[in-house]
């Protein structure tokens, strides 16, 4: 993957250190998913080659430690150490040597304990990693060899249908499959090295509606199970411009609902998502958003408007250079049995479906990847990607954990519309058959 000129990174090279810390997370995401080296970033790109200063590299290394990117932390501290080799500042050199030693110790500790850099409750945003320890003695230890073998088996097992295998493995092993075992495939899908299958089927959606028979929607089926497809011409260029213009002045740093070590719902893991967000309802921006909602309803036959809880407000998001979101899910099956879950029954029930409207084209990066389904989808302005978050029996469809790959060139804008489950009972009824999935958007074929 080609990373474009360093000067496009808003945090580099003319900025204060607080901006470096803010931009470092996106930079680390780009490195993880594109395999670009610290040296390439340090020395700069393009005709106007402007590199990084030592203190900037130290701050990036610290950010890598905080986010669990221990291998990159070591690499950035080593890069800073090499860059300062000619310096006469002995205190700086001693400090860098200490940082390198501490980062290596942390890195090796995780590898020897787990065989990989662990995704856990303490570091929810940790990137997986299965490299060898820096300590030569630890590389040959029986403990590390045992855990490394387990990791390789985990990756091999994750290449199967993890959703179907969920009942045959422990909960802990299942989540390791989702977040750790699938990471090598996820990275390839983000890079475009592994191409997803082309559209399985293209069709006109009209649902025997008299109006749509004259002007049907174009629909591309990109995955049959779990069902996912693209509806074309949901948003028009002038509408997109208006929504983006209105949203720009109200964007805030995104947080993400997650769980703490006690299993309670909490938010604030902002390091898992590097983006800006605002929310808009059809009432607050009626002209374009009401039109989008109406078109989505006509194309999908989902109920978005009959009650206040039929769907959520539009989530308008902007991902700049390096903007990404790590693997997550849009709904949760806890809500199906536990009404206490704050985002579930008290607010209209679980999210049955996600409708992601693309507002801009991203020249490089920015794919939406479903590693469990082997699917990567690139942006298409004005079109909407639709997928089911839960199966027709009410259980979570694990293959729809997805990742927003880092933007490596350009700017990514999307508008998410989450559709609540209870309001869809008449049009997309429940199934009594355990494990059955919803089909695509053809009402003559509701289940698969």
Regions found by a protein language model. Name each.
Residues 1-384, 390-448:
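Fe(II)/2-oxoglutarate oxygenase catalytic core
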